[in-house]
Amino acid sequence: MDFKETLLMPKTDFPMRGNLPNREPQMQEEWKDMNIYEKVQARTKGRPLFVLHDGPPYANGDIHMGHALNKVLKDMIVRYKSMAGFHAPYVPGWDTHGLPIEQALTKSGVDRKSMSVAEFRKLCEEFARKQIDRQREQFMRLGVRGDWWNPYVTLDKGFEAQQVKVFGEMAKKGYIYKGKKPVYWSPSSESALAEAEIEYHDKRSPSIYVAFPVKDGKNVLQQDEKIVIWTTTPWTIPANLGIAVHPELEYSVVAVKGEKYVVASGLVETLESALEWENPEILRTIKGVDLEYVVAEHPIYGRDSLVVLGDHVTLDAGTGCVHTAPGHGEEDYIVGQKYGLDVLCPVDDKGYMTAEAPGFEGLFYDEANKPITQKLDECGALLKLTFITHSYAHDWRTKKPVIYRATAQWFASIENFRDELLRAIQEVKWVPEWGETRLYNMVRDRGDWCISRQRVWGVPIPIFYGENGEPIITDETINHVSELFRKHGSNVWFEWETKDLLPEGFTHESSPNGQFTREMDIMDVWFDSGSSHQGVLVEREELDRPADLYLEGSDQYRGWFNSSLSTSVAITGKAPYKGVLSHGFTLDGEGKKMSKSLGNVVIPNDVMKQLGADILRLWVASVDYQADVRVSDKILKQVSEVYRKIRNTYRFLLGNLHDFHPATHRVAIDQLNGLDRYMLAKLNDVINRVKKAYDEYQFSTVYHELHNFCTIELSSFYMDIAKDTLYVKHADHPDRRATQTVMYDVLVALAKLLSPIIPHTADEVWKHIPGVEEESVQLTDMPEPIELGDVSELKQKWDAFINVRDDVLKALENARNEKVIGKSLTAAITLYADGDVRQLLEELGPLDKLFIVSAVKVAGSVADAPKEAESYDDLAIVVEKAVGETCERCWVVSPTVGTNNEHPTLCADCAETVATYYVTK
């Protein structure tokens, strides 16, 4: 007789290998066929609503690891919430306006000048929609569940209509105004930029010190004295109209080689070195406040340069006397307004010097640095020229430097509702907590928001002008334009006559002849996405404002978190979100920024083709995402190994439940032995800790808890001990059915708990679990702890046993190394124990099964142990070769092998089992 046939070995169709790159797309097709998103929504309808509002990625190009990190984090939260008592719809979105799409079309050979604005905008829309299709497919391949075929898109008519309403409401409250002031200007994009569109890179710039002769010293300075300024932008010298000093700083008149220079006293020593002054002599000192209204002379043009007071002046660098060009700097502009200085800006849209900079007109601003510096040298005003490398503002799209340039722009006046913004920030839950301080400080210190852009692909600013140039924004015009956009889209602004965009019969006192024009600038794209709380949360019936959560990268404190807060507080007085969660950036394995030139870019599509989406998702769960995270082939390989262990755990559990049907085979809790109840108690602990971690968005805790549970509590402990019961006992043995009961509960819980992280694998497991009714684990709820009563004593006892077992395993390993035994089933152990350990050993049983050896004897106290015994706390262990023969069926070494004539190669237990259940009588 082949005794292997009498062993109940694991049987399952659940494959050992995940083969995720092939199996996941099949699973996703099944989800699509069963309308899984709609089914989840239908199942949870009526529960408390949880809205995670999707910050829209830009519709251009393939997704990168930052996208993958972001979307998987969102998906894990939404999946968990829908299994944890909430109704959690997820509406993905896309940001579709702006320069990158214009540039992509131009690069592809589209000649913008050969067509109308409306025609070009139609091409932009076509391009954006193709990009959405491309990215949607990739996001869905990640296993992200959402309303993918009904997303929100910022170019959709309904969204644009709501955006116009937001603008109109802000205008109605007096928050929108037009002004000429310096804004970030990108010559490469020919447009104003918002702070969120700026990034910093190192740039080499000239560093010059320039002397401005005193023209009218106001009895404080003399005409032979010169005020020294420092700048790294010589091209702005033609725009100089003033010199700022700090009212509370002390200034010195310093004599050097017959010249007299005015600089901050605190910088004399630094300047002595920087300007190579020999034996400088301080002639007198003056308070900054006393220098106000002194008139200096522009070294090139001879015009007045007024000395003004400014709190922005510091001793950090320069001379303490700050070159002031109101057309080229925010602080310069503010102080210039105070003193009535003109806003001179001799640079055009493309960055070329205009006729307002005589002698330099037609030069690109950066190229004007050299001739301007040479001219200053000719005038005898240049004291020093060097070059420095410093961090400088660049256009985030073109990667080219930007300048400050005063132009006529539309602004949202943050000043008018700054206090409301700051109050709203304090009412939001921020994770990490430092997010609150970061945004609070940004909002506290930020200037007004420049919302106009000199481009064509975007939502037009819905403003008309009367015959006298007066801007017209009324409830009537806003509502009418909003309805036009809802019906026809915003392209009509560029296609129709102005009169056709106005309400029928519209009149206004600024246009006695009924003639009107319209604004041709578009809105900043941050106004688009920043209006999504209105365009999506209010517009869509299944959502609500405020959202429960906004979750984006930490760069969005100055981007979407900020713009959304600004528009929402402006029109509702409240933040659009109850909570904000931010994540870090994705770096390579060494913590370096990914770049094509370094060859260290990890591409999500490649990872999914090679390893599968569940591996990428498991990586997301494994990292501390609130800081910057690392990813590389090596790291993903380590995650794959963890996945393999989890999958093996699933497979072992399924394999040993092949003949278990919960309806008929489940054993009642009170019928379970101590070890089985202990395992369920450990499962309860894991369920509680994992659900708490999910609630707190601590996914790495979920990952470690479940990985450790699979490898330590299950594989290395319970499943190891359970094998004998599962394989050797007959099918319906109460101990075997009890073990299967525990395994079943563990399996169902593990499928549910891991479902938000590895949904493809969890659903694959679910299909193989006997007795489950739901067609997908996604249509179930998170597991609840099993009612076990008070288990504190039980846990204490078995925790203590695990410590004893660890000591026994060490002793067995040492005996194996010394060739005393082979496998642990060839061993017999004698235990000498004192105190609690002895009591524990006497209470537990059968010890040979628990230690997975052939024989265990509990002898005297530790003091009685022979010298060769291995000693541990309150325990000494002797390992010997077990006496008897090896049973052919269970591999235990037993003196009872050979005592049964029918089955002489079996131990007594196996002989009885075989005779009773497997021999035909």
From Swiss-Prot:
Highest taxon of the lineage: Bacteria
Motif 'KMSKS' region mapped to chain: 593-597
Main subcellular localisation: cytoplasm
Motif ('HIGH' region): 57-67
InterPro entries noted in UniProt: aa-tRNA-synth_I_CS (IPR001412), aa-tRNA-synth_Ia (IPR002300), Anticodon_Ile_BEm (IPR033708), Ile-tRNA-ligase (IPR002301), Ile-tRNA-ligase_type1 (IPR023585), Ile-tRNA_ligase (IPR050081), M/V/L/I-tRNA-synth_anticd-bd (IPR013155), Rossmann-like_a/b/a_fold (IPR014729)
EC number: 6.1.1.5
Catalytic function, reaction form: tRNA(Ile) + L-isoleucine + ATP = L-isoleucyl-tRNA(Ile) + AMP + diphosphate
Keywords: Aminoacyl-tRNA synthetase, ATP-binding, Cytoplasm, Ligase, Metal-binding, Nucleotide-binding, Protein biosynthesis, Zinc
Chain residues that bind L-isoleucyl-5'-AMP: 552
Keyword rRNA-binding annotated: no
Any one GO BP annotation for this protein: isoleucyl-tRNA aminoacylation
Entry binding sites for ATP: 596
Reported cofactor(s): Zn(2+)
GO molecular function, one term: isoleucine-tRNA ligase activity
Cofactor note: Binds 1 zinc ion per subunit.
NCBIfam families cross-referenced by the UniProt entry: ileS (TIGR00392)
Function statement: Catalyzes the attachment of isoleucine to tRNA(Ile). As IleRS can inadvertently accommodate and process structurally similar amino acids such as valine, to avoid such errors it has two additional distinct tRNA(Ile)-dependent editing activities. One activity is designated as 'pretransfer' editing and involves the hydrolysis of activated Val-AMP. The other activity is designated 'posttransfer' editing and involves deacylation of mischarged Val-tRNA(Ile).
Notes on the domains: IleRS has two distinct active sites: one for aminoacylation and one for editing. The misactivated valine is translocated from the active site to the editing site, which sterically excludes the correctly activated isoleucine. The single editing site contains two valyl binding pockets, one specific for each substrate (Val-AMP or Val-tRNA(Ile)).
Oligomeric and partner information: Monomer.
Protein name listed in UniProt: Isoleucine--tRNA ligase
Provenance organism: Halalkalibacterium halodurans (strain ATCC BAA-125 / DSM 18197 / FERM 7344 / JCM 9153 / C-125)
Chain's gene name: ileS
